[in-house]
C-alpha cells in the first residue's frame, strides 16, 4: 500500500501476497482479506482526497497510471555494477533455494511455510527484473532484501568443511563485489 506510492508497480505483488496468505500460510480469512484490501486502498484514498482538495485528481494520479504502461525490456539500462550485484545475489539465492529444498525437513513446518513464501516472492521479483530491467533501481533493492533470509538460512544451517569453505569464498566474493561497485562509482 504505502510502498506502492513510491513505486506503483509494487501493487502487482499484492496478488502474490494474497496467494501466499491463502495457499502457503493458510492464514487468509475474511478479516485478513479486508485488512489487505484496506491497507492497499488507504494510501490511494488519501491521495484522492488530496486531489479533490486541490481540484486536480488527474494530475495526482497521472504518475501512477504511467507506471503501469510496460515497455519492452531494455537491458542497456543496466549498469555494470548492477549486473555484477544481480549475478552475485542470484548465485547465492539459487544455491540457498537448492539447499533449502534438500534440508527443508529439518525445519519446523511454520518455518518452511514462511520460506516457501520467500521463494515465491524471489521468483516473482526475478521475473520482474528479467521483464523490466530498466526499473532495476527499485527491483534490485527488493531482490536483495527478499534474498537475505534465504541466504542467511543457507549459511546458518550449512554444516561441514565444504560449507565453511563456501562461506569464506562467498565472503571474499562479497568483498570483491563491494570493492568493484565502490571503485566503479556507486552501487545503484
Regions of interest found by a model, annotated:
Residues 61-83, 96-100:
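Juxtamembrane membrane-water interface segments that cap and precede transmembrane helices
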Residues 1-8:
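Membrane-interface alpha helices of multi-pass inner-membrane proteins
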Residues 13-41:
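Perimembrane helix-loop-helix junctions
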Residues 96-121:
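Membrane-interface helix-loop-helix junctions at transmembrane boundaries of multi-pass membrane enzymes
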Residues 177-188:
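Juxtamembrane boundary at the C-terminal end of a transmembrane helix
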Residues 136-154:
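Hydrophobic/aromatic-rich transmembrane helices and adjacent perimembrane loops
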Residues 129-141, 159-163:
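Membrane-interface catalytic loops of GT-C/OST-like multi-pass glycosylation enzymes that act
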Residues 32-69:
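Membrane-lumen/periplasm interface segments of specific transmembrane helices
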Amino acid at each position: 500500500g504505502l510502498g506502492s506510492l513510491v513505486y506503483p508497480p509494487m501493487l502487482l505483488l499484492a496478488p502474490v501476497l494474497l496467494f501466499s496468505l491463502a495457499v502457503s500460510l493458510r492464514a487468509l480469512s475474511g478479516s485478513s482479506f479486508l485488512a489487505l484490501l484496506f491497507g492497499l486502498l488507504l494510501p490511494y484514498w488519501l491521495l484522492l482526497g488530496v486531489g479533490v482538495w486541490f481540484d486536480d485528481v488527474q494530475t495526482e494520479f497521472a504518475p501512477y497510471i504511467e507506471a503501469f504502461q510496460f515497455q519492452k525490456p531494455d537491458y542497456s539500462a543496466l549498469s555494470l555494477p548492477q549486473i555484477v550485484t544481480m549475478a552475485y545475489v542470484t548465485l547465492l539465492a539459487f544455491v540457498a533455494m537448492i539447499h533449502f529444498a534438500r534440508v527443508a525437513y529439518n525445519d519446523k513446518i511454520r518455518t518452511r511455510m514462511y520460506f516457501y513464501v520467500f521463494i515465491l516472492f524471489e521468483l516473482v521479483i526475478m521475473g520482474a527484473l528479467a521483464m523490466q530491467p530498466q526499473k532495476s533501481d527499485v527491483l534490485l533493492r527488493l531482490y536483495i532484501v527478499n534474498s537475505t533470509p534465504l541466504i542467511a538460512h543457507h549459511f546458518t544451517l550449512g554444516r561441514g568443511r565444504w560449507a565453511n569453505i563456501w562461506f569464506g569464498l562467498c565472503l571474499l566474493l562479497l568483498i570483491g563485489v563491494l570493492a568493484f561497485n565502490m571503485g566503479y562509482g556507486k552501487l545503484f
